[in-house]
Each structure stands twice: as structure tokens, then as C-alpha cells.
Amino acid sequence: MQYIELLIMFLSVLLAVAFLTVAERKTLGYMQRRVGPNAVGYYGILMAIADAAKLLLKEIVVPTHADKLILFVSPMISLISALLCWSVIPFAPGVTIYDSNYGFILTLAISSVGVFGTLLAGWSANSKYSLLGSIRSTAQLISYELVLTTIILLCILIGGTMNVSKYIEIQQAIWYGIPLLPLAIIFFIGCVAECARPPFDNVEAESELVSGHMTEYSSSIFVLFFLSEYASILFLSTLTAILFMGGGTGIILGLKANLFAFTYIWVRATLPRVRYDKLINLCWMIFLPILFGSAIAVPAYLYALDAIIILYRPGGL
């Protein structure tokens, strides 16, 4: 039964990715004062199906000196990692594929495996552009995983549980995004960098690295990387909605997640690319010192609050 639920979830995520790509192209079209996709289906809504058909019907071109096994396996690692993260997301009360008391730890462990897909893709292609792109990607992803992990640990410290489902109940009185607004903003910036989306798309900067670690990929194996990127965007948008906006059930959670997913598109259309050294400095010189300072301040504040409550409750100590 659990395998059927996993299959339904995977297909639902892939369908959502298809519509997200259409929404992105339409939104970018409006923001750049052009029409965007409008020929395939009503209002261009079936453009994703046309794109998928075009890519899947093309020939898979494998570089002569590439390590063929790793070249084919690496996009699968990225996609499976991106899809398995969804198994701990509570879509409604009791509707979770794997409702674990260690949900956040599992999420961090599974998502970190996706870095290996990117690294191996760049190395196996035997191309300097791919290799440079994968090195950049690995450094960027590892750096910003530290940011996301630290913020999640701070939320665990405040919430007192690692079960993702519990955070919907905990935030019924007040969303974490209100008292922890600076952390929520840092978390969102970290999510954009973790997905290597503009303005942090130095991994596949067209003017420098063609398509980064995906330069030598074509047809269906390129589609796997494409799907993993957009599945990660939707997952991190949903996780942000649960952590800082109280999550929700069904359509409410979907609306909150779509709000964050739209922000990714908005940022792409608005901001220019950040220079790579400034991106890494932003993580190590600004975000991490702030977060480590918060990691000291938040427990001290919680213990002080507990002491005040104990001291002034009827009967005192």
C-alpha cells in the first residue's frame, strides 16, 4: 500500500512541476512585456507536455570519453533525492507517506544526497565546463545546506520536536514567521541558493559555463535534472510554508507553497546574477555568524522565559 502512495505522490509532484514550468514562462512573459506560451492548448497550458515530448523524442548524445554509467546514474540520484523528500510532508491530518518523529533529520539526510548527483554529473562528462559547474554547485549547495540546517535546528529547539506534522499544531496560535521573521528571510534566501535559481544561478551561468554540470546532457537524461530542480523548488516552498506560515491542510498548504514558488519566479525576473565570491561570502561571513549567534541567544531566551514562568506561577518555586 505504501508503494502505491509513493507512486501517487511522485506522479502528483511531477504533474505539479509541469504546471509550474508553464506558470513560470507565462509570468516571465508578463514581467518582460511579451506574450509567453500561448499556442499549445488553451492559453498555453499544455506547453509543458509539448516540451516533454520534444525532449524525450530527441537522441541521447553521449560524449566519447565520458564515463557512461555514472553519466546516466547521476541525474537519477538527483531526481530520486528530490522526490523522496516529499515522503515526510503532511498534506493533511494523517496524510503523510512516512510520518516519522525524525522527519526533519530524514529530510536533511535525503536532500544532501542530491549533491552527489550534481558532482558526479560534472565529473563523468569529461568536460571542463561540466566539471567547473559541478565544483561551483557542490561548494554552493554545501554552504547553503549549513544555513538551512542551522535554521531548522533552531526551529526544532523552539518547537521541541523533529516531527514535521507537529509544526502545524504548534503554530495554531502564532506563525513562527512573525517572531522569527529575520530567520524566515534568511531561510528563503538559502532555499533559492540551494536550488541554484537566479540570482544565485552561478552553477549554470550561460555566459561562462554554458549549462554548468548539465552541458553534456540531452534528451531524457537532461529532463531528469530539470525535474529534480523544479521538484526541489516545490518541496522547499512547501517546507517554508510549514515551518514559518503554519502549514495547513490540502488547498491551504498548496496556496502557501505556491506563494513561495511564485516568489522564486518573481526574483528570477527582477534581480541580476550575484557574483560567485559575493554569494559564498554572504553565507560564510553574514548568514552563519548571525545564525550561530541566534543559536546561543534562543536557548538563553527560552531558559530565561521558563525561569520567569516558574518563578511567578502560583506557589513559586
UniProtKB/Swiss-Prot annotation:
Organism domain of life: Eukaryota
PROSITE patterns in alphabetical order: COMPLEX1_ND1_1 (PS00667), COMPLEX1_ND1_2 (PS00668)
Primary role: Core subunit of the mitochondrial membrane respiratory chain NADH dehydrogenase (Complex I) that is believed to belong to the minimal assembly required for catalysis. Complex I functions in the transfer of electrons from NADH to the respiratory chain. The immediate electron acceptor for the enzyme is believed to be ubiquinone.
Family as reported in the entry's similarity comment: Belongs to the complex I subunit 1 family.
Organism of origin: Candida albicans (strain SC5314 / ATCC MYA-2876)
Protein name from the UniProt record: NADH-ubiquinone oxidoreductase chain 1
Keyword Transmembrane helix attributed: yes
GO CC annotation, single: respiratory chain complex I
Reactions performed catalytically: a ubiquinone + NADH + 5 H(+)(in) = a ubiquinol + NAD(+) + 4 H(+)(out)
Transmembrane segments: 3-23, 37-57, 69-89, 103-123, 141-161, 173-193, 207-227, 247-267, 282-302
Disulfide bonds: none
Gene field: NAD1
Keyword Kinase (UniProt): no
UniProt-listed HAMAP family: NDH1_NuoH
Keywords attached to this entry: Electron transport, Membrane, Mitochondrion, Mitochondrion inner membrane, NAD, Respiratory chain, Translocase, Transmembrane, Transmembrane helix, Transport, Ubiquinone
EC class (word): translocase
GO function term, MF aspect, one: NADH dehydrogenase (ubiquinone) activity
Intracellular or extracellular location(s): Mitochondrion inner membrane
Bilayer topology: Multi-pass membrane protein
EC number of the protein: 7.1.1.2
InterPro entries in the cross-refs: NADH_UbQ_OxRdtase_su1/FPO, NADH_UbQ_OxRdtase_su1_CS
GO terms, biological process: aerobic respiration; mitochondrial electron transport, NADH to ubiquinone
